[in-house]
Structure formats: structure tokens, C-alpha cells
A protein has these predicted regions:
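Short polar catalytic/cofactor-binding loops
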Residues: 7-14
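Glycine- and acidic-residue-enriched helix-capping/strand-helix junction motifs
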Residues: 14-30
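Glycine-rich beta-alpha loop elements in corrinoid/cobalamin-binding modules
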Residues: 34-137
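Extreme N-terminal starter segment of soluble prokaryotic enzymes
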Residues: 1-5
Length: 137
């Protein structure tokens, strides 16, 4: 059976409504990262977008991959906590602008519940990160 990778897009709705004037942006980071996976045909790849899907309908995944901006922290942590409780054997990875800025602000401890934090261009290392997590390295 193919391993399942679930990309999680969970923007803070208040920030999106007030700062983005209600404009909902497609999570292009998911397509960018998944297109950089080696042997992507060996995975079941899904996208969860909290603006569309209900968290209670999410199914188990081998790896949940998150990204976001600083303002999404509350939503990201809420979704991650819910999924970790339901799927304790899954791996949880986070990257994107939130990790870079938290690293610069010495605030990475706010993401301590994740199994792996990626800082920098995930496109270059996504395949290695996925394989290492699937092989418990």
C-alpha cells in the first residue's frame, strides 16, 4: 500500500478576512512541493484546506505536512493537536514562512509539537525529508 502524504493548509480566518480583504488564495505551495517529490507516483497525495474541509472528516495519513505564516499559528497548532490526538503514529512536519520567521525571532519553541521543522527551501529536500520520516530516521 502506498504511503499517504497529506498537505495541510489552515490559514487563520480572521486574518484572512481582515488583512486579505476576504480574498482566498489557492495553496500553491502544496503543488510546488509535491511537484518536487521524487517518485511521486509511489505516494497517495492529498490536500486538506480548512476553509473547505471539516477537520472531523480528515482521515489518517502517514505524514501530515503543514505550512503557513506567523498569523496562522493558532489554527496550525489547533489542527495539529486534533490530528495528533486522533493519529498518534503519524508524523507531523512544518515548513514555510512561519518557520523561517520563528527561527529568526528565536520562537521555534512555539512549533515544538511537530516531529520536524524545516527552515529554508523545502523544494530542495522534500523527497529526503519524506523518505527519512517514513523510515523513522
Amino acid at each position: 500500500m502506498k504511503p499517504t502524504l497529506t498537505f495541510i493548509h489552515s490559514p487563520d480566518p480572521l486574518y484572512a478576512d481582515n488583512q486579505n480583504y476576504g480574498v482566498e488564495f489557492m495553496p500553491l505551495w502544496v503543488f510546488n512541493l509535491s511537484s518536487n517529490l521524487n517518485n511521486k507516483e509511489n505516494y497517495n497525495i492529498t490536500l486538506y484546506d480548512s476553509r473547505i474541509h471539516k477537520i472531523d472528516n480528515m482521515v489518517e495519513s502517514d505524514i501530515f505536512i503543514f505550512s503557513g505564516i506567523d498569523q496562522d499559528l493558532h489554527m496550525i497548532n489547533s489542527v495539529q493537536e486534533n490530528l495528533r490526538t486522533r493519529y498518534p503514529l503519524s508524523k507531523f512536519i512544518i515548513g514555510g514562512p512561519i518557520t523561517w520567521s520563528f527561527h529568526k525571532a528565536k520562537s521555534l519553541y512555539l512549533l515544538k509539537e511537530f516531529d520536524q521543522i524545516i527552515i529554508g527551501d523545502g523544494e530542495d529536500i522534500i523527497s529526503e525529508v519524506i523518505e527519512n520520516n517514513l523510515n523513522n530516521k
